């Protein structure tokens, strides 16, 4: 299995919200699955989960293949924000991969 040879280290910070094992596991699983499709070696992703009034915000920053990625999504549900974040990240990574491979 090629996925096991590359690790995605997801570092999660919680702001104005209690850290839960469920949120940690869900975020780590979603981000790792998304990034593993595009990473060629070990990668580190930084995620911030925070609450501002009624807004549930998920932010991600990472460096991959010589490019910095930043994604921020918000909704009224933190799990929905995480889902939107990984969808947006997948789109950014796919566009970057297409741009890089079209130059070769």
Which residues make up each language-model segment?
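N-terminal, polar/charged subdomain of small-to-medium soluble alpha/beta proteins
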Residues: 1-104
């Amino acid at each position: 299995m090629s996925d096991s040879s590359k690790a995605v280290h997801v570092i999660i910070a919680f702001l104005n919200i209690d850290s839960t094992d469920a949120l940690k596991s869900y975020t780590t699983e979603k981000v790792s699955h998304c990034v593993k499709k595009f990473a060629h070696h070990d990668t580190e992703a930084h995620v911030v989960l925070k609450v501002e009034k009624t807004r549930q915000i998920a932010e991600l920053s990472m460096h991959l293949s010589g490019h910095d990625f930043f994604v921020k999504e918000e909704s009224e549900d933190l799990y929905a924000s995480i889902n939107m974040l990984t969808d947006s990240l997948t789109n950014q990574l796919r566009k970057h991969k297409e741009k890089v491979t079209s130059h070769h």
